[in-house]
Amino acid sequence: IFYFEEKPLSQILEEKLHIKIYIENDTRSMAYGEYLQGVVKGEKNILFINISWGLGIGIIIDGKVYFGKSGFSGEFGHFSFFENEILCHCGKKGCLETGASGSALYRTLLERYKEGSNTILASKIDAGEYIGLSDLIDAIHKEDMLSIEILEEIGFNLGKGIAGLMNIF
């Protein structure tokens, strides 16, 4: 039987380990790491973009991580961006993440293949094997048109989203 106290996990760990504990999301942690030791070392204001299965931003203002009013700053992938019917994992439709992320790239590849597009990744798709970004890049180097088209489309959408961020930061 599990017993869960109504305490933050960081507080429970601090009591057990006797050290200060901070629990943070991946993107804000990466942004802070770049601020401390990365290519932006010495800058006071940073906008860090994490492009992965989803999209997120870490914001550093005057040398401090920005959390936002409710602690959920940086949900870049959930900007209302498209007029599509693709349901985002957040429950909304039209999020930038539905057309400009790793998950969008993968979903689009599978959809277009099932619709009849040819790709050198067909055997991996048919076998249910994992297809990563490196597989897509290899396919592009081998001039796989479907992979090229999808990366161009995702890149275009992502570029438009990033351009919008640059205008507000």
Task: Set out the residue ranges of the language-model regions.
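ATP-binding/phosphotransfer module of carbohydrate and carboxylate kinases, centering on a glycine-rich
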Residues: Q11, E15-I19, Q37, G42, ...
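Intrinsically disordered, low-complexity boundary segments flanking structured domains
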Residues: Y35, V65-G68, S123
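Conserved active-site and cofactor/substrate-binding residues in soluble primary-metabolism enzymes
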Residues: F4, P8, N25, M30, ...
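Short active-site-adjacent structural elements
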Residues: Y32, G56-G58, M166
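Glycine-rich phosphate-binding loop and adjoining helix at the ATP-binding site
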Residues: I1-N45
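Alpha-helix N-cap/helix-start and coil->helix boundary motif
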Residues: R28-S29, G54, G102, Y106
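Glycine-rich phosphate-binding loop of actin/hexokinase-like ATP-binding domains
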Residues: V40-A100
